[in-house]
Swiss-Prot record:
Co-factor remark: Binds 1 Mg(2+) ion per subunit.
GO CC, alphabetical: cytoplasm; membrane
Catalysis: reaction(s): alpha-D-glucosamine 1-phosphate + acetyl-CoA = N-acetyl-alpha-D-glucosamine 1-phosphate + CoA + H(+); N-acetyl-alpha-D-glucosamine 1-phosphate + UTP + H(+) = UDP-N-acetyl-alpha-D-glucosamine + diphosphate
Start and end residues of each stretch annotated as N-acetyltransferase: 254-458
Location of the region described as Pyrophosphorylase in the Swiss-Prot/TrEMBL record: 1-232
List of residues binding Mg(2+): 108, 230
Pfam families given in the database record: Hexapep, NTP_transf_3
Gene that specifies this protein: glmU
Protein name: Bifunctional protein GlmU
GO molecular function: glucosamine-1-phosphate N-acetyltransferase activity; magnesium ion binding; UDP-N-acetylglucosamine diphosphorylase activity
């Protein structure tokens, strides 16, 4: 099939009213990626060299989204909702370019995979004009049935039109199909709208092709792969299926997940062998983790790069631009954003590091803050190799701490510190003997007087 050209036509024009959302249905996300983008990825993995996405509701928002996740895809607008065949013909310009295979798919089936699509394409390569993808749901009620005879598909029958015998068929229509490019437009143009709704149904091409003496067959996908999303409950179901698959894939690739069901991956998470992930960890888009890292419980990571043998968390937050080098440590209740933590450096607890570099082997004490924002602009903090920053320090950017520099605890550092220098940035402590007792007695007396006055008012 590698020699056969292929176009995917992805139908994504529906309003999706059951989602009860201002966002077009197919832009709701699975693993941080719009549903329709998952469909495009599957089509491309199955050999589609071009993608035509048919849009309607929220067209401008859809165009912007498509540009982000698939710049090469084209969008075509279905101006009126006149049925699925009518929607496919909105992409007539693309279909007419002479592709060998046309994959017709739906933007709300995010779990479809290349294997199911390639099986349908294989049937076209073997001579079929149409290959319809079917599935076997636990309960077929409500689905159109695939009616076969002698190994050929002769009709797709909506349940309300099924005979009693046809209602017993468990093989149902998933809505997706592969159509030979040489026949596609002729078959689509032959679809009529003489039905109760006055719409043009894609399923009619099965009988039209059969009447023209063309071969029509059915292939089978799993129930999960064919799952269509119509509401938030089904969206959550699909998310669960996707996550379960990705967790299994990670574990079989050498990643240890202590409590797999509590770890959530993004569509693009990369994670190396011998990494250990503790319970309740969330990975957002753009995370790359090399082998041997340890991610402790309740960490939240997005847009971050974590090198080999790093240690993260528990309760750590790594935001976009966080770059942890080999054996770096970011501990509990720390946030790192747009910052490099170099080899062996330690940011152990209760710390914010933003727009900064922490040099190799440096140690950042508890409660340290890089003050990087003045309300208008961001500024950079550079902490040199082997530097030590004492607890509860504020580093007011732009500022640099030289190699081996030492910052005393509780300092507010507003000027750069040279290599190997010691810097204090705090008021000198003053101790007044007996003053503590005096204050305590004064405060106790004032509190008692206030309580007495309050009682008198009642």
């Amino acid at each position: 099939m590698s020699q056969r050209s292929c176009l995917s036509v992805i139908l994504a024009a529906g309003e999706g009213t059951r989602m009860k959302s201002a966002l077009p249905k197919v832009l709701h996300q699975i693993a941080g990626l719009p549903m329709v983008a998952h469909v495009v990825k599957a089509a491309d993995a199955a050999g589609a060299s071009s993608d035509a996405i048919v849009i309607g509701h929220g067209a401008e928002e859809m165009r912007k989204a498509v540009t982000k996740f698939s710049p090469k895809a084209e969008t075509f607008v279905q101006e009126e909702r006149l049925g699925t065949a009518h929607a496919v013909l909105a992409a007539r310009e693309a279909i007419s370019r002479g592709y060998d295979d046309i994959l017709v798919m739906f933007g709300d089936t995010p779990l479809i995979d290349a294997e199911a699509l390639n099986l349908a394409r294989l049937k076209l390569a073997e001579g079929a004009a149409v290959a319809v993808i079917g599935f076997r749901p636990p309960l077929p009620n409500g689905y159109g049935r695939l009616v076969e005879k002698g190994g050929k598909l002769i009709a797709i029958r909506e349940e309300k039109d099924c005979s009693e015998a046809e209602k017993k068929i468990g093989f149902c229509n998933a809505g997706m199909m592969a159509v030979a490019g040489a026949h596609a437009l002729k078959l689509l143009d032959a679809v009529g709208n003489k039905n109760a709704k006055g719409e043009y149904y894609l399923t009619d091409i099965v009988e039209i092709a059969g009447a023209q003496g063309l071969d029509v067959v059915a292939t089978e996908a799993s129930f999960e792969n064919a799952l269509g999303i119509n509401n938030r409950a089904e969206l959550a179901q699909a998310e669960g299926i996707w996550q379960a698959r990705r967790r299994q894939e990670a574990m079989l690739s050498g990643v240890t997940l202590i409590a797999p069901e509590t770890v959530y991956f993004s569509h693009d998470t990369e994670i190396g062998a011998d990494t250990v992930v503790e319970p309740n960890v969330w990975f957002g888009p753009g995370v790359k983790i090399a082998g041997g890292a340890k991610i402790h419980a309740f960490s939240h990571i997005e847009g971050a790069t974590i090198a080999a043998n790093c240690d993260v968390g528990p309760f750590a937050r790594l935001r976009p631009g966080a770059d942890l080098r080999n054996k770096a440590k970011v501990g509990n209740f720390c946030e790192v954003k747009q910052a490099v933590i170099e080899e062996g450096a330690k940011v152990n607890h209760l710390t914010y590091i933003g727009d900064a570099r922490v040099g190799a082997g440096a140690n950042i004490g508890a409660g340290t803050i890089t003050c990087n924002y003045d309300g208008f602009s961001k500024f950079f903090t550079d902490i040199g190799e082997g530097a030590f920053v004492g607890s509860n320090s504020s580093l007011v950017a732009p500022v640099s701490i030289g190699k081996g520099g030492y910052i005393a605890s509780g300092s507010v550092i507003t000027e750069s510190v040279p290599d190997d220098a010691l810097a204090f940035g705090r008021a000198r402590q003053k101790t007044i003997p007996g003053k503590g007792k005096e204050l305590r007695e004064r405060f106790a007396s004032a509190a008692a007087a206030k309580k007495k006055a309050a009682g008198a008012d009642h």
